[in-house]
A protein has these predicted regions:
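Active-site-proximal loop/helix segment associated with metal-binding centers of metalloenzymes
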Residues: 96-178, 182-191, 197
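Active-site neighborhood of phospho(di)ester-bond hydrolases with catalytic His/Asp-centered motifs
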Residues: 3-6, 23-31, 60, 177-182, ...
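Conserved catalytic cores of phosphodiester-cleaving nucleases, focusing on short active-site segments
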Residues: 1-3, 103
Length: 275
């Protein structure tokens, strides 16, 4: 699942040694070039590599219309099916729903530009099997899967063994939210409440707070305020203005409010297992 697709997306995928065949869904937060213009090229490359199956593109209507026109010209006979899912700028959509993951949208505040964020919620996991107790109570193999989802076990003599005796609590489900371009907004805090990891843009530091407001962006301090208000586990800052030589002021501002803040770096991998 690829979230936003700037012109450097293919290069980043190659550096990370990600196979093109792994791209099944592309989520586009808004139609500014640094988030969208790499997508036509990526779709063409997928066809060139004869990737099969289906790629679902989740995008606003003008972007879908443009993609259809471009693909009709440069790659009209793709090796895979492209399924377009039109996004609602008001948010509130479920754009992906599998047995293990749900992806929903929420509205961002990026000036006059329609823009949404994405929230990824892992679905509740099954309970862990207590092998010693399962063997002790001689639970048949074909009954074990039902134990994972809360079923009790009834012995041949009618004795009921409670599920809690045979299982251990499940691993906590994880969640992640992505806020691409947005001004400070309490509604965003509501949308990302309780996630384990929040990516939030921090284009400016407080020295350019007025510019951030004018351009529909946030400062690092504002991003941390959103994260703290939402009770997130960790804040990941990105989308920094090129007017800064480094991100030291961003990190310092944010950590004054939320110490568990880190800076996004090219090629970074973050595990939620320890969150």
């Amino acid at each position: 699942m690829l979230v936003d697709c700037g012109e450097g997306a293919q290069l980043s995928m190659r550096r990370a040694r990600l196979k093109y065949s792994r791209v099944t869904d592309v989520l586009i937060s808004h139609l500014h070039g640094d988030h969208f213009l790499g997508l036509p090229g990526l779709l063409s490359t997928l066809s060139l590599h004869e990737v099969g199956g289906k790629v679902r593109v989740h995008c606003f209507r003008p972007g879908i219309e443009l993609l259809r026109h471009i693909m009709a010209v440069v790659a009209h006979d793709t090796s895979f099916e492209i399924e377009y899912n039109e996004l609602d700028p008001r948010g509130g959509q479920t754009v992906f729903d599998s047995k293990s993951l749900t992806v929903t949208t929420f509205r961002l505040s990026h000036g006059q530009t329609p823009c949404v964020g994405f929230r990824f919620d892992e679905k509740p996991k099954g309970r862990h099997i207590n092998g010693d107790m399962v063997r002790y109570h001689q639970v048949p193999v074909w009954k074990i899967e039902s134990l994972r989802w809360g079923a009790d076990f009834e012995k041949p003599d009618g004795t009921v063994i409670p599920n809690e005796t045979l299982t251990l609590p499940p691993s906590p489900s994880k969640s992640y939210a992505y806020c691409s371009d947005t001004a400070y907004s309490h509604k965003v805090a509501e949308a990302v409440r309780g996630v384990d990891l929040l990516y939030h843009e921090a284009t400016y530091c407080e020295d350019n707070g007025s510019k951030a407001a004018e351009r529909g962006h946030s400062t690092a301090r504002q991003a941390a305020m959103i994260a703290a208000e939402a009770g997130v586990g960790q804040l990941l800052l990105g989308h920094f203005s090129k007017s800064y030589v480094d991100e030291e002021c961003h990190l310092a501002e944010a950590r004054e409010i939320l110490p568990n803040t880190i800076i996004a770096k090219e090629g970074m991998k973050i595990s939620l297992l320890g969150q």
